[in-house]
Swiss-Prot record:
It catalyses: L-seryl-[protein] + ATP = O-phospho-L-seryl-[protein] + ADP + H(+); L-threonyl-[protein] + ATP = O-phospho-L-threonyl-[protein] + ADP + H(+). One of its GO terms (cellular component) is endoplasmic reticulum. It comes from Arabidopsis thaliana. It is found in: Membrane. Residues 313-675 are cytoplasmic. This is L-type lectin-domain containing receptor kinase IV.1. The gene is LECRK41. The lineage of its organism: Eukaryota, Viridiplantae, Streptophyta, Embryophyta, Tracheophyta. PROSITE patterns: PROTEIN_KINASE_ATP (PS00107), PROTEIN_KINASE_DOM (PS50011), PROTEIN_KINASE_ST (PS00108). The keyword Zinc-finger does not apply. ATP binds at L353, G354, T355, G356, G357, F358, G359, S360, V361, K376. Residues 347-624 form the Protein kinase domain. GO terms for molecular function: ATP binding; carbohydrate binding; protein serine kinase activity; protein serine/threonine kinase activity.
Length: 675
C-alpha cells in the first residue's frame, strides 16, 4: 500500500513539474530597470540614474545588449511547438545629427543572454558577416532599422522588419501605423520622440504581428507587419529575451523606457505615466553644429572636390593607353590597363610570378569574372613593327590546344606591351626539377608532361594554319595546370610564318643550352631548331639537371648532353636518370626518352626527327631505332664526349642521317654552328 501511494506521489510530482513548463509567465518594467538583479547588460549598455535602459551611447562602432536574466521555457520539449508570447516596449532614438542615425534597435529572442559574435553598424549587434543567415543561430528578432543596407534588401532607412536567423527580413515595412480611419501614418524612428511597439506570436496559427504607435496612443487594431512562420524549428526549448543595438559612424543614443513580456498570455500593458523620462535634448548642440560644423564640412567638401579632380586627372594619366586606328579590329582581344592593374593589385612584387629577359610575369584575378590570369609586361624594344607584332599576338590568341597556355589578349601603353595568359596554378616545371625541390614528379608525371609538350609543339609546327616557331622550348617555359598537365607557354619569342615560307630572323633569341648550332651560326629559327631545344628539354626532365651548369668547385662547365652520351657509351645510360624519381619507373621508357633526347640534340638538323616522329616514338606508335655508339665506329661516325661531340651516326634503315667530319664537342657545336 505504501509503495502504491509513493508511486502516485512521484507521478503527481513529476507531472506537476512537466505542467509547470507550460504555465504562463509575465513581467513588466514600468519604473525603470534594475540590473543586475533582473537584467543582464553587455557592451556599452548602461542604466541611467532615473532607470532608463540606455542601449548605446555616443561611441561609434559599438554594440549594446540587455537580456532578462532568467531563461524562458518556450517549448514543453525540445521537439515541441513554441508557445504563444507577446511583448511591448517603449523606445526612443536620439542622434547628434537630426537627419542621420545609426543603426537601430532590435527586440531579440536568443539562445544565450549575450550576443558576443554580433558586429556593430548594419549588423545591429545581432550577427556578423560569417554567421548571418545560419540556421544554427536560433534567433528571432524584430528590428527597428534606421540605415538603408542594400546587402540585406532593406525597404528604406526607416523601417521595421521581422528577422529569423538573418538580417534579411522575412517581412518588413516603413515605420508607421494605421489609424482608426484606416489611413497609414508615417513615424520617424530617429525623431527623438518615444514610441511604442507590440510584438505578438500566436502558437496555434504561427502568426507574427508587429504593431507601432506614437507614445500615449492605444494599440492600433491593424498591425504594421505580419508574417506567418512556425518558430518551432527556430527557437530552442529555453531562450532569453531582450534587446540589441549598435552604433555606426554617426553618434546615436538608443533608449528603452519600459518593457513588458508575457508567455501564454498577453504582455501586461505598460503604465506609460510611470515610465522614466527621457533626458532633455538641448537644441543648442544642434545649432552649434550648424554654426561651426557646417562651415568646416563645407571647407572639407571643397578640398575634397579639389583632391577628387586631381585624383581623376592623375588616374587618367596613370591608366592612359595607346590606341591607334588600326587596333580597332583587334578590340575584343584587347584588355584595359585599368582592369589589369586592379587584377594584379597594382603589379606589386607580392604577385610577381617570375622575371625573365623579356619581362616580368604577375598573377592577377580579373574583377567581375574572377578569372585567374598571368600578365607578362614586355618592353616595346622586344618586338618588330608594333602593328605586325599585335597582329601576331591576336593570331596566336586564336590557337586552341590543351597543351598550350592560352593567350587571352594584350594591352599596349607607355612603351610596353602586356600579354595576358590563362593562369597555371602549379607554376613552371623547372621548380620541380632543380635545387632539391620540395615536391618532385615521379616518372609517370614526367612522361605525361613530356607527351603534352611534344603534342603542343607538334600543333605549332604542323597542325595549325600557320607554322609557329617557338624559339625557347625549356622547362621554365612549360607550365603545369591543376592536374599537372604540361602546357607550353611564353609566345613572346614566337614568330609566325606561312606554311612553305623561308623563316628569317635578324638576331638570335633563346637560351644557352637549348640553341641549335645552325641557329647560333645563321640566326635562322626553324622547326629543326625547336626540335633541338626539345631534345635538351627531354634530357632536362629525365635527368633533373640543366643543359649547362657552371660548377664553381671545379671551375668547369657541365654539359648535360655530353654527360648522358658518355654514360650511354659506357653502357650505363640509365645512370643519368634523376634519382629523385625513385625506383618505380619504366626503365625502358626512361632509356628511350634519354636516347630520343640525344637524337633530337644531333648537331645536323637533317638528322633530327620531326615533332610528328617524336610523338610516334613517345606514344609507342613507332620504335626508336637502335642507337649504339659502338656500332657506329666502323662507319667513321661517333659521339665525341671528352674530345668533342662531333658526329652522331644513326643506323636507320632509311639512311636519313649524315655524320659530321669535325671534332668539336657539343658545346663547340652550339657556339660555332657544328662546323
Amino acid at each position: 500500500m505504501f509503495l502504491k501511494l509513493l508511486t502516485i506521489f512521484f507521478f503527481f510530482f513529476f507531472n506537476l513539474i512537466f505542467q509547470s513548463s507550460s504555465q504562463s509567465l509575465n513581467f513588466a518594467y514600468n519604473n525603470g530597470f534594475n540590473p543586475p538583479t533582473d537584467l543582464s547588460i553587455q557592451g556599452i549598455t548602461t542604466v541611467t540614474p532615473n532607470g532608463l535602459l540606455k542601449l548605446t551611447n555616443t561611441t561609434v562602432q559599438k554594440t549594446g545588449h540587455a537580456f532578462y536574466t532568467k531563461p524562458i521555457r518556450f517549448k514543453d520539449s525540445p521537439n515541441g511547438t513554441v508557445s504563444s508570447f507577446s511583448t511591448s516596449f517603449v523606445f526612443a532614438i536620439h542622434s547628434q545629427i537630426a537627419i542621420l542615425s545609426g543603426h537601430g534597435i532590435a527586440f531579440v529572442v536568443a539562445p544565450n543572454a549575450s550576443l558576443p559574435y554580433g558586429n556593430p553598424s548594419q549588423y545591429i549587434g545581432l550577427f556578423n558577416l560569417a554567421n548571418n543567415g545560419n540556421e544554427t543561430n536560433h534567433v528571432f528578432a524584430v528590428e527597428l532599422d534606421t540605415i538603408l543596407s542594400t546587402e540585406f534588401n532593406d525597404t528604406n532607412d526607416n523601417h521595421v522588419g521581422i528577422d529569423i536567423n538573418s538580417l534579411k527580413s522575412v517581412q518588413s515595412s516603413p515605420a508607421g501605423y494605421w489609424d482608426e480611419k484606416g489611413q497609414f501614418k508615417n513615424l520617424t524612428l530617429i525623431s527623438r520622440k518615444p514610441m511604442q511597439v507590440w510584438v505578438d506570436y500566436d502558437g496555434r496559427t504561427n502568426k507574427i504581428d508587429v504593431t507601432m504607435a506614437p507614445f500615449n496612443e492605444d494599440k492600433p487594431t491593424r498591425p504594421l507587419v505580419t508574417a506567418v512562420r512556425d518558430l518551432s524549428s527556430v527557437l530552442l526549448q529555453d531562450m532569453y529575451v531582450g534587446f540589441s543595438s549598435a552604433t555606426g559612424s554617426v553618434l546615436s543614443e538608443h533608449y528603452i523606457l519600459g518593457w513588458s513580456f508575457g508567455l501564454n498570455e498577453k504582455a501586461p500593458p505598460l503604465a506609460l505615466s510611470r515610465l522614466p523620462k527621457l533626458p532633455r535634448f538641448e537644441p543648442k548642440r544642434i545649432s552649434e553644429f550648424y554654426k561651426i560644423g557646417m562651415p568646416l564640412i563645407s571647407l572639407f567638401l571643397i578640398f575634397s572636390f579639389i583632391f577628387l579632380v586631381c585624383y581623376i586627372v592623375r588616374r587618367r594619366r596613370k591608366f592612359a593607353e595607346e590606341l591607334e586606328e588600326w587596333e580597332k579590329e583587334f578590340g575584343k582581344n584587347r584588355f584595359r590597363f585599368k582592369d589589369l592593374y586592379y587584377a594584379t593589385k597594382g603589379f606589386k612584387e607580392k604577385g610577381l610570378l617570375g622575371t625573365g629577359g623579356f619581362g616580368s610575369v604577375y598573377k592577377g584575378v580579373m574583377p567581375g569574372t574572377k578569372l585567374e590570369i598571368a600578365v607578362k609586361r614586355v618592353s616595346h624594344e622586344s618586338r618588330q613593327g608594333m602593328k605586325e607584332f599585335v597582329a601576331e599576338i591576336v593570331s596566336i590568341g586564336r590557337m586552341s590546344h590543351r597543351n598550350l597556355v592560352p593567350l587571352l589578349g594584350y594591352c599596349r601603353r607607355r612603351g610596353e606591351l602586356l600579354l595576358v595568359y590563362d593562369y597555371m596554378p602549379n607554376g613552371s616545371l623547372d621548380k620541380y626539377l632543380y635545387n632539391t625541390p620540395e615536391v618532385t614528379l615521379n616518372w609517370k608525371q614526367r612522361i605525361k608532361v613530356i607527351l603534352g609538350v611534344a603534342s603542343g609543339l607538334f600543333y605549332l609546327h604542323e597542325e595549325w594554319e600557320q607554322v609557329v616557331i617557338h624559339r625557347d622550348v625549356k622547362a621554365s617555359n612549360v607550365l603545369l595546370d591543376g592536374e599537372l598537365n604540361g602546357r607550353l607557354g611564353d609566345f613572346g619569342l614566337a614568330r609566325l610564318y606561312d606554311h612553305g615560307s623561308d623563316p628569317q630572323t635578324t638576331h638570335v633569341v633563346g637560351t644557352l643550352g637549348y640553341l641549335a648550332p645552325e641557329h647560333t651560326r645563321t640566326g635562322r629559327a626553324t622547326m629543326a631548331t625547336d626540335v633541338f631545344a626539345f631534345g635538351a628539354f627531354l634530357l632536362e626532365v629525365a635527368c633533373g639537371r640543366r643543359p649547362i651548369e657552371f660548377q664553381q668547385e671545379t671551375d668547369e662547365t657541365f654539359l648535360l648532353v655530353d654527360w648522358v652520351f658518355g654514360l650511354w657509351n659506357k653502357g650505363d645510360i640509365l645512370a643519368a636518370k634523376d634519382p629523385n624519381m625513385g625506383s618505380e619507373c619504366d626503365e625502358k621508357e626512361v632509356e628511350m626518352v634519354l636516347k630520343l633526347g640525344l637524337l633530337c640534340s644531333h648537331s645536323d638538323p637533317r638528322a633530327r626527327p620531326s615533332m610528328r616522329q617524336v610523338l610516334h616514338y613517345l606514344r609507342g606508335d613507332a620504335k626508336l631505332p637502335e642507337l649504339s655508339p659502338l656500332d657506329l665506329s666502323g662507319s667513321g661516325m661517333m659521339f665525341g664526349v671528352h674530345d668533342g661531340f662531333s658526329e652522331l651516326g644513326m643506323s636507320y634503315s632509311s639512311s636519313v642521317f649524315k655524320g659530321f667530319t669535325g671534332g668539336s664537342s657539343i658545346a663547340d657545336s652550339q657556339l660555332s654552328g657544328g662546323r
